[in-house]
């Protein structure tokens, strides 16, 4: 166990769930530390007052519950979507992108309250411990960090349940009377891990899905929507302007009702192991398709291809926890520069788990029907010019062929 004897006051990232409630009591009983709780409203869709009441029941005097939904979407989710960031080809980074924001607020509250440490409930096997701590150290290099899962003697969730029963800490149950899946949720996504999901050969039970209906149960009639963009960010739906968080919440509703955004994947964790999770990102899945569509008519080919080359590295930085790193900020500057003329409107058809782009328009469009038409282009393009273009590009290939024959 790491030595934390000199820690007097700790700010705990507190959800009110099993892990963090046990941690709260453990910090009090094992370290004798004064605990401050921070609960972020990230749009997880849960009432936060139970977390406050639970903290009060456990003797906490300083309780911070903050609505960070707009900050989350505007300053973290939207910048990430400007890059079309996807980890390992499929994962829209819904958990990853929330961690630096939580760390930022933990550091801010520690400064306000005079706390000398922060604590989190991430396990020693996962990515979140890295994300929380890299972000915290980037913002305050001297902060002390307590990660109880790496320090205490508990080895399983069963051990935690026994501790909770001993200390009369209430634990939520699922419909089957068991402790719930390991769940993370915010306005962008929800994820479920553990129990039967640990067997990647077994299909996830339907009750695991919290954010979407099944595609099979979705309406037989398609839903048509239009998403408007300015400088790479979504600003409106069907011509109605709305705030960042409100817009994403509305897209979530459309995605939920049409069975969009389900993902069952096995991913490579930063710490070296593979894990299986069931993710739901209804609004984000729609947003990604819409953003790529508006870029298709407003981005120059060279810029678009360079963005696609940079994206995997950018996504990896977020997944690994390097949001506040200089390299992520460098890439962000380039990505944001590329978005200066990414504006317009995209029409989407949503149908039984599918997002289909059926129209796109922009006042900054680079698409020219005069250039591309199969009909008379009235001199807009001279097809004879292609001969020289091909000859020059073929020069090295012909030279190689002549040598090798």
Swiss-Prot record:
GO terms for molecular function: argininosuccinate synthase activity; ATP binding. It catalyses: L-citrulline + L-aspartate + ATP = 2-(N(omega)-L-arginino)succinate + AMP + diphosphate + H(+). Its main location: cytoplasm. GO terms for biological process: argininosuccinate metabolic process; L-arginine biosynthetic process; urea cycle. ATP binds at residues 13-21, 40, 121. NCBIfam families: argG (TIGR00032), PRK00509.1 (NF001770). This is Argininosuccinate synthase. The gene is argG.
